[in-house]
């Protein structure tokens, strides 16, 4: 419980934009991601983490979030063809795979998201 309170307080203190995206990707941690997911009403599974980790790696390599097409192609390679479609990704991240996963991954809101 103490760790949860600490993470919650940390989340409150960290600088975010008006929509809750971290302003500094360096502030991100796994515990913080879990707290953000909780606020987004998402229980993280291995499939969520596959998407989150891919988005973080892509962002730090190219300094931009991946397009939906890139995300689907990567997920196809990582977790299989049946799960590599936009319908499945929307089940994981109902508010939008790129948008919601980016928020949980601690990177800026994708410029392609409204």
Curated annotation (Swiss-Prot):
Interacts with the TusBCD complex. Interacts with MnmA. GO terms for biological process: tRNA wobble position uridine thiolation. InterPro entries: DsrC-like_C (IPR042072), DsrC-like_dom_sf (IPR025526), DsrC-like_N (IPR043163), DsrC/TusE (IPR007453). PANTHER family: SULFURTRANSFERASE TUSE (PTHR37010:SF1). The lineage of its organism: Bacteria, Pseudomonadati, Pseudomonadota, Gammaproteobacteria, Enterobacterales. It is found in: Cytoplasm. The active site is at 113 (cysteine persulfide intermediate). GO terms for molecular function: sulfur carrier activity; transferase activity. This is Sulfurtransferase TusE. Disulfide bonds: none annotated. Part of a sulfur-relay system required for 2-thiolation of 5-methylaminomethyl-2-thiouridine (mnm(5)s(2)U) at tRNA wobble positions. Could accept sulfur from TusD. Belongs to the DsrC/TusE family. It comes from the Bacteria. It comes from Buchnera aphidicola subsp. Schizaphis graminum (strain Sg). GO terms for cellular component: cytoplasm. Keywords: Cytoplasm, Transferase, tRNA processing. Its EC number is 2.8.1.-.
């Amino acid at each position: 419980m103490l760790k949860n309170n600490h993470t919650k307080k940390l989340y409150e203190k960290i600088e975010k934009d008006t929509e809750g995206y971290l302003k500094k990707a360096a502030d991100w941690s796994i515990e913080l991601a879990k707290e953000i997911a909780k606020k987004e009403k998402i229980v993280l599974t291995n499939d969520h983490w596959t998407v989150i980790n891919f988005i973080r790696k892509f962002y730090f390599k190219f300094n931009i979030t991946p397009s939906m097409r890139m995300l689907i192609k990567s997920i196809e390679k990582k977790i299989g063809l049946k799960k590599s479609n936009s319908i499945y990704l929307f089940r994981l991240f109902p508010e939008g795979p790129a948008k919601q996963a980016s928020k949980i991954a601690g990177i800026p809101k994708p410029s392609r998201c409204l």
